[in-house]
């Protein structure tokens, strides 16, 4: 489906047109329907919208779609486009009028392109008439160009509309399947309910088992057995009703099943119709590549004709030479005879193709109308079946469950009676506790009594079906009487104790009652035995509440103190920069001067101590200083005179300084411009380094992907090698087996033919040599001997037929095991074709099994099934015609070397595929080896590796500030984060900035770019010719010399103590 704007795409099912919009534009489902009405003029009640999986689009789905779209906008991501398919309910009636009404806004009538005005013009026309014709032809040309563009747009739109219409049919079929699935699910639920009842309530189960059980168990709370609570006649009637309901439901469900099967057949016909329509109406944009090419040539031709026309119209006949006028006339004739007919032909061709697309679309719409009508009929049938049968089935199932409960009461009665006894004991115990509690507490009796009544009502509702069996004595009046006087309760009920209940449970165990029922009674009795008449005190509750509140206050106080302590700790850590994470303001490198720098006061004391030493030493030379003072006074006088002279010169210099101020301003501007250019160059260099890092990572990722692909290919090659070897082995075994079988068959045929000829010869000799008497005497012996020979020949013939069929069946299994299927062609001629996935259904044990019996269901060939049927018939009839027919079928299979040629060709294809895979693997292996050879190493460098060399930052003299900080970087030997140091002031006026390469000192060291290798540095040995004029280079390491920084070792780069560094000799290989 083509790209549309927005996150919602609406598709018109009958026209195939689509519209893109945003779902958040609509507030409600009705707003979306109004948008559909405006676009496609479908009445609101007739709009029917489906989702891509066939479900009906409802308000809940619309709200979910809107909420997801809003969430996607809030998160700043683009939501995937949802597709909805819009149908017109009127089209499901199947009428042509509904189709015409639904497509009246979509129907288009194409107009055939008109002929050019130049077609009817004469060859020789006047100047004025020619100008008029050419001007008119320009208008015709513009109209034709518009028509051609429209025709081509119609063709492209038809391809997309066809795909949308076929997709709408598929979605509608899924909708019908979902609708039918709901009905089938109801049917299966009903059938399972009936089967469950049939399994739980088997015939005579309650008579054979439960009746004997009830007659055995004593009703300990009353006289007699439990059977006194059961009405046997009522149970018999319930059994008869159950059987009748089962028969009635089975009949109704079979009718319902028939309706579902009929509907399934209709759906299958609709699916086949949709599939057949999709096969007949197939089109693709690639089928119209010629039209697109013609459209491109058409544009060029139109452009050329317009230029030629303007050239002719712009000519001035009064000033044009005769030669130019002659060329204009020839150009006019050529245009009339060649260009204009060609343009008209292109327009007519596209008109014809567009009209054909319109006709095809109208035909497809009529086909869709029939399919929509069939879907409506199928849906109506489903609804009728549901309304007519399912409702009655539900009523009968409800009655079936009710009857089942009556029968199940018999089997549940022992357990319920046990619960009844336990409840009697609990009530007796409760009343005793209440009587005792009443003397002490009278205020809470009403609430306790109310809870007891609620519990009794719940128990009665849980076992309401047994209410007519057990008769409760109403003690509510006596409970009310309890509040009027202080006399204890006197309720006439049996006295039940725990021993009685335990005796009843033991009786159930002796009668083989289910173990889970006994466990239930024991558990319930255990709970009731622990029952205590306890009433909660409101005072205790209030105290508990107060203690809980105080504990909550203490917890909240501790939480506040913890929050304050965490805030103080955070402030302390924030003020201490040494605890900050590693970054720009806090380096993770070791500061060797930390806590070792003298304070300001210490420095002042040291300087004071040095000045005192100098004074003491100066006293020893006081005399010399006095003589020097006299000389200095003389020089001072001379200097004063010189100062006067300099003052005069200063006045003149000031005037010169005023003039030099302007020059200084200009110099500042120039210097600022140079600094800006220098900053740009530095930024460019940083960007280049980052690009190199990214390129190296990308290269490594691609290399890893290539390695994984090569490993996968190697695994595939090994798999195909083993598979080819297995197939070759199977081929050789089968060919050898087939050759042996054929040789044995031919030898047996030859022996049998020889025996037949010999027997015939002996028979003829005996017939000629005997006389009438001997004939009479031996007439009873010769037929017997001949009959024996004939029977032996039949037995031999039968074995030959079995051997021939076994060889044939083995050959068919061989073919299907290698993916070949024996079938019949259109002319009933045998052919062997390649079928993908055929080998998956073949059991490998067929090949290894030595048994002559082959499972015919595993063989997919229809020809094999036909031959097997002939062979089976031949075993029964042994007729001559059947034998000849059987042999002729086998001869058709082996004639013209069809079997041998197919097997050899199949194995040849497998061998060619293996060779192709080996060739591809060899090529990819060479690519990987080349990549491994050319990859750049960034850590654990060795001799022979390729490495990226970059210059380090800073001047060689500034060891402590620039070089040391650069070389101490934990990321690599090159500092990629700090800017370059400022240049000396004295040389600023001599800087010359080139437009491509920044200034670099010759003594700047070069280092290898490494990643994540701490404590090791690699520096390039001095080689001015190798790095001259380069910002970086890729080199191959020739040799490496290891150094470790200690007190006496070599340390030209002022590295910290303990640092390991290598001096590398490399040769430049290439530049990336």
Curated annotation (Swiss-Prot):
- List where in the cell it is found: Preautophagosomal structure membrane; Vacuole membrane
GO process terms (BP): autophagosome assembly; autophagy of mitochondrion; cellular response to nitrogen starvation; cytoplasm to vacuole targeting by the Cvt pathway; pexophagy; piecemeal microautophagy of the nucleus; positive regulation of autophagosome assembly; protein localization to phagophore assembly site
Gene Ontology, cellular component aspect: Atg1/ULK1 kinase complex; phagophore assembly site membrane; vacuolar membrane
Q: What is its main location?
A: membrane
* GO molecular function terms attached to this record: molecular adaptor activity; protein kinase binding; SNARE binding
Write out the entry's keywords from A to Z.
Answer: Autophagy, Coiled coil, Membrane, Protein transport, Transport, Vacuole
Q: Which domain of life is it from?
A: Eukaryota
Q: Which InterPro entries match?
A: ATG11, Atg11_C, ATG17-like_dom
Q: Which residues form a coiled coil?
A: 615-804
Give one Pfam family, short name only.
ATG11
Membrane-topology annotation of the record = Peripheral membrane protein
Spell out the subunit comment.
Answer: Homodimer.
What does this protein's UniProt record list under function?
A: Involved in cytoplasm to vacuole transport (Cvt), pexophagy, mitophagy and nucleophagy. Recruits mitochondria for their selective degradation via autophagy (mitophagy) during starvation. Works as scaffold proteins that recruit ATG proteins to the pre-autophagosome (PAS), the site of vesicle/autophagosome formation. Required for the Cvt vesicles completion.
Identify its protein family.
Answer: Belongs to the ATG11 family.
Protein name per UniProt: Autophagy-related protein 11
């Amino acid at each position: 489906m083509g790209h549309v704007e927005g996150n919602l795409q609406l598709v018109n099912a009958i026209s195939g047109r689509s519209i893109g919009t945003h779902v958040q534009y609509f507030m409600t489902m009705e707003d979306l329907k109004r948008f559909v009405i405006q676009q496609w003029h479908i009445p609101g009640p007739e709009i029917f919208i489906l989702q891509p999986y066939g479900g009906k689009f409802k308000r809940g789905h619309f709200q979910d779609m809107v909420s997801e779209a809003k969430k996607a906008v809030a998160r700043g991501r683009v939501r995937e486009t949802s597709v909805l398919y819009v149908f017109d309910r009127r089209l499901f009636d199947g009428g042509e009028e509904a189709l015409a009404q639904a497509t009246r806004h979509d129907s288009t009538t194409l107009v055939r392109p008109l002929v050019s005005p130049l077609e009817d013009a004469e060859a020789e026309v006047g100047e004025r008439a020619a100008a008029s014709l050419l001007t008119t032809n320009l208008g015709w040309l513009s109209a034709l160009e518009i028509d051609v563009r429209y025709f081509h747009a119609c063709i492209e739109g038809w391809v997309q509309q066809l795909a949308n219409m076929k997709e709408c049919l598929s979605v509608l079929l899924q909708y019908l399947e979902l609708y039918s699935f709901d009905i089938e699910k109801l049917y299966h639920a009903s059938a399972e309910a009936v089967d469950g009842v049939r399994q739980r309530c088997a015939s005579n189960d309650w008579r054979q088992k439960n009746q004997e059980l009830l007659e055995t168990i004593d009703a300990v709370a009353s006289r007699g057995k439990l059977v006194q609570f059961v009405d046997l006649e009522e149970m018999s009637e319930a059994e008869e009703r159950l059987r009748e309901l089962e028969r009635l439901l089975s009949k109704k469900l079979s009718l319902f099943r028939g309706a579902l099967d009929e509907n399934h057949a209709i759906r299958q016909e609709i699916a086949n119709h949709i599939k057949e329509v999709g096969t007949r109406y197939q089109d693709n944009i690639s089928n119209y590549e010629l039209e697109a090419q013609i459209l491109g040539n058409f544009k060029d031709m139109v452009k050329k004709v317009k230029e030629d026309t303007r050239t002719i119209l712009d000519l001035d006949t009064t000033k044009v030479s005769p030669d130019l006028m002659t060329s204009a006339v020839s150009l006019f004739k050529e245009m009339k005879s060649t260009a204009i007919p060609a343009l008209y032909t292109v327009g007519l061709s596209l008109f014809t193709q567009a009209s054909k697309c319109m006709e095809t679309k109208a035909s497809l719409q009529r086909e869709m109308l029939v399919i929509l009508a069939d879907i409506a009929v199928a849906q109506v049938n489903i609804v009728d079946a549901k309304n007519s049968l399912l409702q009655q089935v539900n009523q009968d199932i409800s009655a079936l469950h009710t009857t089942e409960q009556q029968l199940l009461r018999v089997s549940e009665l022992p357990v319920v009676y046990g619960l009844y006894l336990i409840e009697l004991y609990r009530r007796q115990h409760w009343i005793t506790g209440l009587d005792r509690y009443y003397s002490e507490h009278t205020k809470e009796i009403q609430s306790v009594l109310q809870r007891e009544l609620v519990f009794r009502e719940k128990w009665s509702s849980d076992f309401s079906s047994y209410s007519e069996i057990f008769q409760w004595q109403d003690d509510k009046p006596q409970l009310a009487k309890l509040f009027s006087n202080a006399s204890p309760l006197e309720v006439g009920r049996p006295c039940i104790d725990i021993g009685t209940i335990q005796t009843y449970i033991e009786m159930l165990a002796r009668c083989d009652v289910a173990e889970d029922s006994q466990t239930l009674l024991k558990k319930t009795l255990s709970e009731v035995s622990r029952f205590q008449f306890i009433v909660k005190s409101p005072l205790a509750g209030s105290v508990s509440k107060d203690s809980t509140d105080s504990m909550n206050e203490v917890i909240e106080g501790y939480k506040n103190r913890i929050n304050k302590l965490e805030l103080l700790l955070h402030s302390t850590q924030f003020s201490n920069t040494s605890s900050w994470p590693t970054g720009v303001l806090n380096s993770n490198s070791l500061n060797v001067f930390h806590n070792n720098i003298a304070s300001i006061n210490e420095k002042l004391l040291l300087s004071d101590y040095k000045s005192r030493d100098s004074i003491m030493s100066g006293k020893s030379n006081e005399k010399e200083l006095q003589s020097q003072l006299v000389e200095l006074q003389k020089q001072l006088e001379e200097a004063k005179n010189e100062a006067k002279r300099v003052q005069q010169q200063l006045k003149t210099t000031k005037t010169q300084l005023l003039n030099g101020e302007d020059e200084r301003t200009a110099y500042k501007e120039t210097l600022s411009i140079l600094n800006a250019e220098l900053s740009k160059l530095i930024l460019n260099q940083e960007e280049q380094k980052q690009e190199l890092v990214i390129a190296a990572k990308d290269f490594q990722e691609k290399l890893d992907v290539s390695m994984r692909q090569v490993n996968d290919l190697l695994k595939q090659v090994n798999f195909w090698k083993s598979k080819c070897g297995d197939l070759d082995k199977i081929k050789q075994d089968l060919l050898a087996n087939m050759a042996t079988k054929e040789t044995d068959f031919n030898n047996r045929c030859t022996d049998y033919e020889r025996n037949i000829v010999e027997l015939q010869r002996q028979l003829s000799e005996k017939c000629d040599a005997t006389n009438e008497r001997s004939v009479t005497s031996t007439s009873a012996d010769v037929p017997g001997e001949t009959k024996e020979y004939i029977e032996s020949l039949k037995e031999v013939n039968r074995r030959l037929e079995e051997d021939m069929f076994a060889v044939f069946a083995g050959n068919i299994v061989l073919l299907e095991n290698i993916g070949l299927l024996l079938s019949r062609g259109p002319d009933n001629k045998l052919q062997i074709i390649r079928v993908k996935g055929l080998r998956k259904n073949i059991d490998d044990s067929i090949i290894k099994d030595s048994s002559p019996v082959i499972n015919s269901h595993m063989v997919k060939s229809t020809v094999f099934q036909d031959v097997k049927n002939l062979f089976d018939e031949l075993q029964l009839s042994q007729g001559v015609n059947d034998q000849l027919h059987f042999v002729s079928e086998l001869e058709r299979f082996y004639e013209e070397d069809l079997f041998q040629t197919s097997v050899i060709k199949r194995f040849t294809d497998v061998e060619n595929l293996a060779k192709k895979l080996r060739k591809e693997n060899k090529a990819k292996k060479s690519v990987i080896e080349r990549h491994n050879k050319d990859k750049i190493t960034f850590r654990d460098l060795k001799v022979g590796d390729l490495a990226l060399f970059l210059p380090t930052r800073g001047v060689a003299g500034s060891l402590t500030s620039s070089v040391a900080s650069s070389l101490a970087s934990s990321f690599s030997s090159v500092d990629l984060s700090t800017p370059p140091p400022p240049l000396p002031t004295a040389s600023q006026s001599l800087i010359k900035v080139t437009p491509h390469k920044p200034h670099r000192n010759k003594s700047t060291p070069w280092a290898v770019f490494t990643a994540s290798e701490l404590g090791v540095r690699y520096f390039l040995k001095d080689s001015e010719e190798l790095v001259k004029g380069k910002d970086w280079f890729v080199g191959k390491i020739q040799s490496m010399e290891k150094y470790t920084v200690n007190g006496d070792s070599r340390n030209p780069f002022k590295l910290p103590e303990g640092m390991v560094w290598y001096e590398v000799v490399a040769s430049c290989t290439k530049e990336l």
